[in-house]
């Protein structure tokens, strides 16, 4: 799956293809991409319910699939088991585990909602080889904060109000602020990764 799945797209559809980083038009993606485009040190990976784990620069075409659970919508998963089946079919848990073990990275920044987080099977697959920041809800960080090399930061309505962002786009805004701070003052990310320093005091 992943890049292999992208490469398997029939040629007749490729004339409509766009880069994966430009395919998604949600607030989180828009907020984040403004800064990613300026930060050459970023290697953007996307967890896709259509392709698996892909590079931001992979060419893709649109699709109707999501990891969100809603039994009233045909493009959503109708249960947790269906969500898991889709994730496994796209080899997301194994692909994410492999990505986190890639020692060529200096650090990681994970901006996933709860449904997409679950698709990555975090509680059995996460053992990062590099320091990693994760923004999440109170529920999602409860167990992740126990994993070595993962620094969890709560992202909720209070933070959304502080940073003038919608709740669904907040993680993208926070990720963008980290990248902007690093571009303005190299070394800022090191402070963000420090377990003894609140990330919110840095950005």
What does each of the following model-derived ranges do?
Residues 1-31:
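Active-site helix-to-loop segments that bind/position phosphate- or nucleotide-bearing substrates
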Residues 35-36, 40, 44, 48-49:
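Extended, H/D-rich, highly charged conserved domains that either
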Residues 43, 106-109, 111-115, 135-138:
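Structural motif
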Residues 50-99:
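Long, charge-dense
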Residues 142-203:
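C-terminal accessory extensions appended to soluble enzyme cores
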């Amino acid at each position: 799956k992943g890049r292999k799945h992208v490469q398997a797209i029939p040629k007749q559809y490729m004339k409509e293809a766009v880069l994966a980083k430009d395919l998604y038009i949600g607030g989180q993606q828009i907020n984040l991409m403004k800064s990613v485009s300026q930060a050459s040190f970023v290697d953007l990976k996307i967890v896709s319910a259509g392709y698996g784990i892909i590079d931001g620069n992979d060419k893709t075409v649109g699709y109707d699939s999501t990891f969100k659970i809603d039994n009233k919508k045909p493009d959503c998963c109708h249960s947790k088991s269906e969500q898991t089946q889709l994730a496994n079919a796209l080899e997301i848990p194994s692909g994410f585990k492999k990505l986190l073990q890639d020692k060529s990275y200096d650090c990681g920044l994970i901006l996933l909602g709860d449904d997409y987080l679950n698709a990555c099977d975090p509680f059995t697959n996460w053992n990062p080889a590099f320091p990693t920041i994760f923004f999440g809800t109170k529920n999602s960080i409860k167990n992740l904060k126990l994993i070595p090399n993962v620094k969890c930061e709560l992202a909720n309505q209070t933070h959304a109000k502080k940073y003038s962002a919608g709740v669904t786009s907040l993680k993208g805004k926070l990720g963008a602020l980290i990248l902007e701070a690093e571009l303005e003052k190299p070394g800022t990310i090191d402070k963000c990764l420090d377990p003894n320093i609140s990330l919110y005091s840095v950005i």
